[in-house]
UniProtKB/Swiss-Prot annotation:
The lineage of its organism: Eukaryota, Viridiplantae, Streptophyta, Embryophyta, Tracheophyta. Induction: By cold, dehydration and salt stress. This is Zinc finger AN1 domain-containing stress-associated protein 14. Pfam families: zf-AN1. It comes from Oryza sativa subsp. japonica. It comes from the Eukaryota. One of its GO terms (molecular function) is zinc ion binding. May be involved in environmental stress response.
Length: 237
């Protein structure tokens, strides 16, 4: 319940003002026209104060963020490993994509750019140098294979040439008897006259052998028993 008391501050020394209860104290309510003036003044005063307080709060928040970031940056240093790995992977993927694009352009007949062609030339040079080093360090299997093929081809050519040009004294085939022409295979008998015969014609009197066994026997005996001639010694007395 409001109480009545004199309030000379309201411009009415003889009047009384209503006291409105307020938490922590009480004050006399001003007249309506003064209430409007006070409301406008308070609004004008509060507006700049609110903007300045908002600016101050924003500045304080930014300062706190900087200090917070600086503290964590000091406490835990920034780890660039994952960043570098990501950058390296992205660069490698980009280079692979560039190589594929250049290959497609080359296949399509479009000349690649100068930088791309220079990079391709550098890679080709490095591959040639690396291949040369490897070839010097370890011989290539293809080289040995080519040498073996060349040698086998040369041997086959020699064999074909020798078979196509027989000797003047043509001999009968080795797997047939020279008299009856029967196949003897590996069981044939080789005579000193140079022919191959079967078991029935292996002897000299059966196939009319022209080899002189007596002359060869004498030569063999002469070689095995050389004649030793002693020199006469003249003794002087």
């Amino acid at each position: 319940m409001a109480t009545k008391r004199k309030c000379p501050a309201n411009g009415d020394d003889g009047g009384v003002a209503d006291l409105e209860p307020v938490a922590g104290g009480s004050f006399a309510s001003p007249p309506p026209e003064k209430k409007a003036k006070l409301t406008v003044a308070v609004a004008v005063a509060v507006a700049p104060s609110s903007s300045s307080s908002a600016t101050t709060a924003a500045a304080g928040e930014a300062t706190a963020k900087r200090e917070h970031g600086g503290f964590f940056a000091f406490a835990r240093p920034e780890n660039n490993t994952r960043l570098s790995v990501a950058v390296a992977s992205s660069s490698s993927s980009a280079s692979a994509a560039a190589e594929k694009a250049m290959a497609k352009l080359t296949v399509a007949g479009v000349a690649p750019s100068s930088s791309a062609s220079a990079a391709a030339a550098g890679k080709a040079t490095a591959k040639r140098e690396y291949g040369g080093f490897c070839a010097f360090a370890r011989p290539d299997d293809k080289t040995r294979w080519r040498v073996a093929v060349a040698s086998s081809a040369a041997a086959a050519a020699d064999a074909s040439y020798s078979s196509s040009s027989p000797a003047t004294g043509e001999q009968p085939e080795a797997n047939r008897c020279a008299t009856c022409r029967r196949k003897v295979g590996l069981t044939g008998f080789k005579c000193r006259c140079g022919g191959t015969f079967c078991g029935g014609h292996r002897y000299a009197d059966e196939h009319g052998c022209g080899f002189d066994y007596k002359s060869s026997g004498r030569e063999l005996i002469a070689k095995q028993n050389p004649v030793v001639v002693a020199d006469k010694l003249a003794f002087r007395i």
